[in-house]
Amino acid sequence: MTDTLIPNGCKSNGPVENGYFKKGCNPFAQTGRSKLQNKRAVLNQKIIKQMRMRAGAENLLKATSNNKVREQVVLELSYVNSDLQLLMEQLEGLNSSVEVYQNVQESSSIPLIPLGLKETKDVDFSVPLKDFILEHYSEDGSNFQNQIDDLMDLRQACRTPSRNNSGVDLIANYFSQLSFLETRFFSPTRQIGIFFTWYDSFTGMPVCQNNISLEKASMLFNMAALYSQIGTRADRQTLAGLEDAIAAFQKSARVLHFLKETFTHTPSYDMSPAMLSMLLRLMLAQAHECLFEQITLPGIRNEFFCLLKMAQEAAKVAETYAQVHQSMIETPITKNVPFFWTTMSQLKINHYNSLAHYFVSTALLDHQLNPSDDEDKQEKALSQLYDAMPEGRSPLDILKNKDERRRIGKAHLQRSIMGHEEAIRTHCRCRHLQKLDILSDILRASLNRSLTKFEQNDKEDEFTDYMLAPDIISKTEKKAEMEIPAATKVKVTDLFQRLGPLSVFSAKQRWTAPRTIRLILQDRDLGFTLKGDAPVQIQSLDPLCPAAAGGLKEGDYLVAVGDTDCKWMGVSDVMKLLKDVDEEGINIRVVSMMDSSSQPMATKSATYCGGLSKTYSMICLAHDEDDKNPKSRKVAKKPSFLSFGLKNKKSSSTLSLPNADYSRPWNRPSANYSNSHHESGLY
């Protein structure tokens, strides 16, 4: 999507400035990426409609005993299931449309796979937040209408982020605001009437919750998806572009890892632990592929040691994609992974393995062991290439015997040719792969190069002794690792900071209504002292002073002096306001903290229920854009996905989420974060 801006006087979509924020892309811009997102939104609505029809038909089938009605319902169910299948195939096609995300100047690089952004429905924060501000903070919610509008505009902008670091900063900004919002408005003792609806990016199934953790998890997924799109868009014909692509994919992997480790019970397939593990492997594999391209970009010298090194590097790329492919075909997620993705990973396994065999064959066929060469060094390099030497021969025998070098080199060429042919067959099996002309050209050029090499070394009168070339041990000098996103540099200001310091004025704390007390000095004495940071507390209260008689209590928080709000003032600033009090005195406002331990825990609302419908929210069946206010609906209460962590009493509960008010959580050092992409480190 082009980085067009919403015409509102904002020039870019960076951090908050002067109390406002910058915008995302123009949602009406008709670009390739925006068209795909619009199609995804339309498909999601069609899937909802078919799911409602199927749920209604299944309920009718259970309720009726009339055979004629049952036959009609069964027939209708078959139509609905057929329509659902078609819609799922269309959604899979959107996830397979990777060509619009590639760099327009790419002409010799294999396309990469980006993640699509999750779609969501609009959320109206206005009424619930104003009600909560009035009930909980005893302030007029209308005074915060501008801040609420800013929050809603910020969320709307995050639905169409620009495909660059500014778009990432925009999502990171909103994610931090969500942490502020959670602390200020989402109380464990009561439900707030805000429902978040998000659609699964692979199945299109909606999930609806009134838990802000679903919103935070979905924003992290979109941040990882945006990083993957940035990496896909990079110009891989330049070193700078390859560095950008590597960094973007590694940052995407880091965000996915944080999402997987933090939000452990998300009720949608695309954010399940198994799916996130696969996506994380995919991002690291693509980062490693870019590292390989970075090595090959200046050109590969036709030199013995260089060719063996490149063979092991190519084998390493194939190995990483083999791990990705294995995770794609595992039972929990294989039915939801696009066929394009599995075939693309299989194709890259064959392609890079074939490249590895081609490099080894070139090293053996084009070079001979000369007296001036370092014999020990070549012997060591060749011995490290295989687990077991071909036909039990020693490395030195192969290096010194010209015929043996030629025979083993041709065997590697044969494996290279077979691998390239298999890659082309894999390419022909998937209609979405067939649309990628660049990929087809690369595969055929690689095959022709191996065939030409084989013809140059094939003699008509030569007796062909067929042998199978051994596998090549993978090895790399540069390893793809998860990288901390640069979005940690975004400075965020709490939109609702006027409510007071978060450490005191939060949703989990309860106070009395503000009390107005007339403060009159006696012999220039207040009758009490102040302590603490903002807001200050009353201490050492003289029970005989006029303030105590007016209702002031020990431990009260001073929130206003006269018409001046002093929630954010320290002791020295408040004393400056009180030192000039005349004989008539001045009004002060105080609040007293109440014991909240006796408050009952709020019941979690339903999130999803059963079957293909295991990711489908029953709330979504009763709500849509054109429906009435959700408050008028009655929904059966069930534990949310976060309550599973409490039920099982696990130490790593999803309720213990990091607070992003000072720094991004994925930037914090943690023993749980491994920098290795090996299975033992990540999974």
UniProtKB/Swiss-Prot annotation:
Keywords: Coiled coil, Cytoplasm. SMART domains: BRO1, Hr1, PDZ. Pfam families: BRO1, HR1, PDZ. It is found in: Cytoplasm. CDD domains: BRO1_Rhophilin_2 (cd09249), HR1_Rhophilin-2 (cd11634), PDZ_rhophilin-like (cd06712). One of its GO terms (biological process) is negative regulation of stress fiber assembly. Residues 515-593 form the PDZ domain. Residues 111-460 form the BRO1 domain. Residues 649-683 are annotated as: Disordered. Belongs to the RHPN family. This is Rhophilin-2. It comes from Danio rerio. The lineage of its organism: Eukaryota, Metazoa, Chordata, Craniata, Vertebrata. The gene is rhpn2.
